[in-house]
Amino acid sequence: MPSSISVKLVAAESLYKRDVFRSPDPFAVLTIDGYQTKSTSAAKKTLNPYWNETFKFDDINENSILTIQVFDQKKFKKKDQGFLGVVNVRVGDVLGHLDEDTATSSGRPREETITRDLKKSNDGMAVSGRLIVVLSKLPSSSPHSQAPSGHTASSSTNTSSTTRTNGHSTSSTRNHSTSHPSRGTAQAVESTLQSGTTAATNTATTSHRSTNSTSSATRQYSSFEDQYGRLPPGWERRTDNFGRTYYVDHNTRTTTWKRPTLDQTEAERGNQLNANTELERRQHRGRTLPGGSSDNSSVTVQVGGGSNIPPVNGAAAAAFAATGGTTSGLGELPSGWEQRFTPEGRAYFVDHNTRTTTWVDPRRQQYIRTYGPTNTTIQQQPVSQLGPLPSGWEMRLTNTARVYFVDHNTKTTTWDDPRLPSSLDQNVPQYKRDFRRKVIYFRSQPALRILPGQCHIKVRRKNIFEDAYQEIMRQTPEDLKKRLMIKFDGEEGLDYGGVSREFFFLLSHEMFNPFYCLFEYSAYDNYTIQINPNSGINPEHLNYFKFIGRVVGLGVFHRRFLDAFFVGALYKMMLRKKVVLQDMEGVDAEVYNSLNWMLENSIDGVLDLTFSADDERFGEVVTVDLKPDGRNIEVTDGNKKEYVELYTQWRIVDRVQEQFKAFMDGFNELIPEDLVTVFDERELELLIGGIAEIDIEDWKKHTDYRGYQESDEVIQWFWKCVSEWDNEQRARLLQFTTGTSRIPVNGFKDLQGSDGPRRFTIEKAGEVQQLPKSHTCFNRVDLPQYVDYDSMKQKLTLAVEETIGFGQE
């Protein structure tokens, strides 16, 4: 039986701003089944309009489609009509069966508040934001004549009322509503809806009339029957947002387009289940961001709402599930739960048992499903079992209903659910997956949040060490936790990430240079460095070590890599772990071999050693006791193990105790000691320095092209040139284009830009006589379309090895 409903359009938020210098004047057009049309007033110059206007719609059934479109009044007469987004809502999905008694215990109509993300139309124009809508079924009134479904809007005379916040009420027909922004706008709205220029309204109108035109004038069927008779037990008939009928089997929690029959066998039902599963998988594979590339190694997260989601229109289904909206018929909330509403009208749920809140309706079991590189399900967990997101995290949906996550602590985004294990390829080493989980936890801690404001540091390239020392040491730790803004003297470049990456790259080369006597190369090789025990030759050495500790902490805090590797023992010392004999191998291989030989062989009568060590200090040999009166205690087979432990402790730790303490004082001013202990020494090395080895195939795999395609000759020449270079030249190219020669542990897929992860990009730009130009903040290189390989290689090499400094376009 047809019913009447009330639709209150509360507000919209975060609308898309198409003009740089002005905000839109948004108004909304509400349409039921394509022939009942209402319009709100226009809110002036805002991206967050607040209407709070109520509309009444008659002759509604649960299959009716409510379409809400948002336009910019200033542009409504233009070609695109100032389109700002559309939302389609099936009334039955929100209010349930309209023939049921849905009144509350107080006799007032039950209201359902929903929040829906705005969607694109067929023209593909970018939209953003969401609508807050309140729907309620009105009490039954006296019978009235029903207009035939074949009548157009211009011939109908049904009346409705429009209620606004100021209390005024006016009467309007379908053609003319006094609540329209203007008379011209109202006529334009009507003509637009009749001509079908808006794809969403046109689709809903066509599908509704095609399916219901023959039956709506005679009888309205319930969800459990149709013109062919009653459905089998446990089956229900529903209509998606485009008016297409599908069937829900509540027995198996599956959906199908095929109408079930009473004699349907279990085998047929099983085949249908498999078919639906495969259909859902194919739909999921096709979900990508607009303009994005489909990468088999990436992981897609899908939110589902059980049997309430039809087998098509996954975008609307995922958007509905993400809002955590309720559906009538779900029953009472579990014990200890309460439903509340935000000031914007969005429903949320309070669990008084655990004193937590969630957007997810506990009566609706939602799943987060993770797909692997072969598009097979590798994880499926209920949202309720995953628990809340870490502090500062938020889950959002793209325009294509793909779930992504926002880390407000670091102002970055990611596809990966921070509550789930690593979404890396399944063939990567286990330590990388473990490391990623630890990093997510580490970054989510309140102490690692970037504070409001900016920290400005200005340095000269030729005096970067001393200038950085003066700038960083004069700042308080709280100031250093604000967003870093690095400025090179005499250069115009703005720091959106690339300048600061180059700052840390250049500074690490200077402050770890043995020329300053603060660090020295290990005896094992000339690549790893260790603290110089004779750094005291510089009377200010402890202040410099505190400064270096601050720089390392700054790099970790702001996600910047340092171009240096310490000996492994230093990372263990930072974690307060005890050093052992194996750590000596990276410090001095000859000493390690000698101590190891002592443990494996008898030394009685062979070695004449005591519990002391000789330390050379600027040409003077000083004897140091490893234990009290150690120089008079002989080393034997019985106590040689103790000697090895004491000598290792002295050789690695005790000689540099003062310098290391100053270093850690500076480091812990930005990174609390208890947080960094979640890592082991190998992971801490990756956290500070990233990975130096460059994988060309991984680089190519995670590269985007603008103006070029991967098959273009210039691109082939570029990768041929990179392949011919050695690792040092590749590192220089990476530093030229991104500001650092290091890459994250997850490879090029996790390269960071100015606003979060940003892939390496090659753009077609510049004249052939020009050198390539880099944009380090955006990991982008402008590569002209050179005419031959030799000229491209020559100019690329010249740009990488000879250019210096930042400019501004």
Swiss-Prot record:
One of its GO terms (biological process) is protein K63-linked ubiquitination. Changing L733S: In RSP5-1; impairs ubiquitin-thioester formation and catalysis of substrate ubiquitination. It comes from Saccharomyces cerevisiae (strain ATCC 204508 / S288c). The active site is at C777 (glycyl thioester intermediate). E3 ubiquitin-protein ligase which accepts ubiquitin from an E2 ubiquitin-conjugating enzyme in the form of a thioester and then directly transfers the ubiquitin to targeted substrates. Component of a RSP5 ubiquitin ligase complex which specifies polyubiquitination and intracellular trafficking of the general amino acid permease GAP1 as well as other cell surface proteins like GAP1, FUR4, MAL61, PMA1 and STE2. Pathway: Protein modification; protein ubiquitination. Residues 229-262, 331-364, 387-420 form the WW domain. This is E3 ubiquitin-protein ligase RSP5.
